[in-house]
UniProtKB/Swiss-Prot annotation:
Pfam families named among the record's database cross-references: DUF4149
Cellular compartments annotated: Membrane
Residues annotated as transmembrane: 18-38, 53-73, 81-101, 166-186
Descriptive protein name: Transmembrane protein 205
Similarity-based family: Belongs to the TMEM205 family.
Protein origin, superkingdom: Eukaryota
Keywords, in A-Z order: Membrane, Transmembrane, Transmembrane helix
PANTHER family noted in UniProt: TRANSMEMBRANE PROTEIN 205 (PTHR46916:SF2)
Free-text function comment from the UniProt entry: In cancer cells, plays a role in resistance to the chemotherapeutic agent cisplatin.
Alphabetical list of InterPro entries matching this protein: TMEM205, TMEM205-like
Cystine crosslinks: none
Length: 189
């Protein structure tokens, strides 16, 4: 086999490993760990853990998307891209853009909004309970109804959190479609 062929095989393997690793991480963080931690930890502890994990998670997602985009862009003649190749480049660029928005803009604002929210909750003796463990009227709902500042802080947090979640789902979908396309190109197992 030619030396260039070996290098081409290595590049393909790196591309597949980085893409599948990123997608696996995204699936775990998005659909497993967050739900498990939310149901198992006190509310403010959950927030603290997420505030430490998410910056790394978003930056790793951003780095993986950048590596895959660079690999793919360098391996194709731009004038002769097939529909699938152009789609894959677009999906990886979308993933890079969404991960960058999350890492550099949304995550810091979401975390800052969470800390502001938790400050008010701590003043009221809230945040130490595991979600779903409280009996009786919801103290957070009562606080929202009585304290307009808290209600505004909560809206701000959920605005950033919602945008961050949409960006994250966009990354998961983009990488998943890239993996599906690669799987469809496999000739045999």
């Amino acid at each position: 086999m030619e030396e260039g062929g070996n290098l081409g095989g290595l590049i393909k393997m790196v591309h597949l490993l980085v893409l599948s690793g990123a997608w696996g991480m995204q699936m775990w963080v998005t659909f497993v760990s967050g739900f498990l931690l939310f149901r198992s930890l006190p509310r403010h502890t959950f927030g603290l853990v997420q505030s430490k994990l998410f910056p790394f998670y978003f930056h790793i997602s951003m780095g993986c998307a950048f590596i895959n985009l660079c690999i793919l862009a360098s391996q194709h003649a731009w004038a002769q891209l097939t529909f699938w190749e152009a789609s894959q480049l677009y999906l990886l660029f979308l993933s890079l853009t969404l991960a960058t928005v999350n890492a550099r803009w949304l995550e810091p604002r979401t975390t800052a909004a969470m800390w502001a929210l938790q400050t008010v909750e701590k003043e009221r003796g809230l945040g130490g309970e595991v979600p779903g463990s409280h009996q009786g009227p919801d103290p957070y709902r009562q606080l929202r109804e009585k304290d307009p500042k808290y209600s505004a802080l909560r809206q701000n947090f959920f605005r950033y959190h919602g945008l961050s979640s949409l960006c994250n789902l966009g990354c998961v979908l983009s990488n998943g479609l890239c993996l599906a396309g690669l799987a469809l190109e496999i000739r045999s197992l």
